[in-house]
Structure formats: C-alpha cells, structure tokens
Amino acid sequence: MKLTYHGHSVVKIETNGKTIFIDPFITGNPLTDLKAEDVHVDVILLTHGHNDHVGDTVSLAKKNDALVIAPYELATYLSWKGVRIHPMHIGGSFTFDFGKVKLTQAFHGSSYVEENETIVYTGMPSGILFHAEGKTIYHAGDTALFSDMKLIGEMNDIDVAFLPIGDNFTMGPKDAAIAAKWLKAKMVVPIHYNTFPVIQQDPQQFVSMIEGIGRVLRIGESIEL
C-alpha cells in the first residue's frame, strides 16, 4: 500500500490495483502539487461536504467513472450531479474489492456552498477507517478532539492516522497530540494546515509533541506500508 500527501487534507491511497483519493481538493488548493486534469482516480472517499474537501470530486468522478463513497446526504447530493455513488453513514462499514471502508464520527459541520451562494446541508461529517492489505488507515477528516477517539484506538490497530492540526476550524496541535495518544497509531501525519492564513501551524512542532510517532510529509511525498 502506498500513501501520498497532496496538501490540505488530500491523501492518495494506492492498493489492490486501485487509486483512491480522500477529499480531493485540488483546484484552488494553493499547496497541492496536482493538476485536476492529470489525475487518475478509481475511487473517491469524502469525509464531509465542505468545498475544501469535496473539491474536484464531480469533475474527477465523471472523467474517470470513479465511484464516490460518502455520508448518505452528501452522496445523494452528488448523485444529482451525475456521479456514481455508494452512500454510507457513521458506524457502518462495507467491504469493496479494493478494501474495507468504515465511517467514524467527527465533530464538525457539513455543507456545500454553490456558485450562487446557496448553502446545501450535506448531513453529518465523518472520519474514515480504511482497511486493505492487512493495514489500517484512519483519516479523521475535519474534527475537534472527542473522547471516542479512545474507542477508535481500542477497536483498531491503526498503522497511519492523518489528523488535522490547523486549529480555528479543527483541532489545533495540542488537541491533535492528545488524539494521537488516544488513537495509539504507529504513525501520525498532520494534515489540514497552512493552506490558508487562519490555519497556519508548524507541523514539526506538532511532531515533537507526540514522542517519535509523528511524521511530516512534504507535498507529494509518499510512504509505503
């Protein structure tokens, strides 16, 4: 399994012959190394409906005939835009041919702002547990610290956890460090920081708080499990 960080909350997973993107915010993302027109994707996983997470989902899904997996309301909304969907909800899991997906809770919001400035409610936000090739990945999405992260850590042997550290909209570094302790992941990668002025953080400072399990991935850098 190969994991690549593409800035903000964008994570690419390559496993079992499939290319999977989590929260493909590419167009308008000042940090990413990608161009949407060059991206190949088989599956898109979405944590919630905010524009900086849905990103290029519709155009990528249509171009690649990619399956979009998302919380029910968000998936339904995207189906009206002509994409293939698999709706899920918090606590539910499903085994696909490329791996097993389970949605966890997240403490955040979920809505999509249309070009005409209409705000569309898109259900509850989520985190994602992804299991494949004997490995477990946890992408927390956008979230505050919440005590059931302890339960997520107890129920899952997490190899890599992607945690937001930007503060303001999500956990900041101190809360994310507590989350890392509770999750008991073998490796913790900070995400959702430095994309915009309001979420400026020093990821190395965060890594120094979590006792040797943290790793800062440069934009476009990969790890193999």
Curated annotation (Swiss-Prot):
Keyword Hydrolase: yes
Any Pfam family: Lactamase_B_2
Keyword RNA-binding: no
GO molecular function: hydrolase activity
Keywords for the protein's UniProt record, in alphabetical order: Hydrolase
InterPro entries: Metallo-B-lactamas, RibonucZ/Hydroxyglut_hydro, UPF0173, UPF0173_UPF0282_UlaG_hydrolase
HAMAP family (alphabetical): UPF0173
NCBIfam families for this protein: PRK00685.1
PANTHER family registered for this protein in UniProt: UPF0173 METAL-DEPENDENT HYDROLASE MJ1163, UPF0173 METAL-DEPENDENT HYDROLASE MJ1163-RELATED
Family: Belongs to the UPF0173 family.
Protein name stated in the entry: UPF0173 metal-dependent hydrolase Aflv_0488
Organism field: Anoxybacillus flavithermus (strain DSM 21510 / WK1)
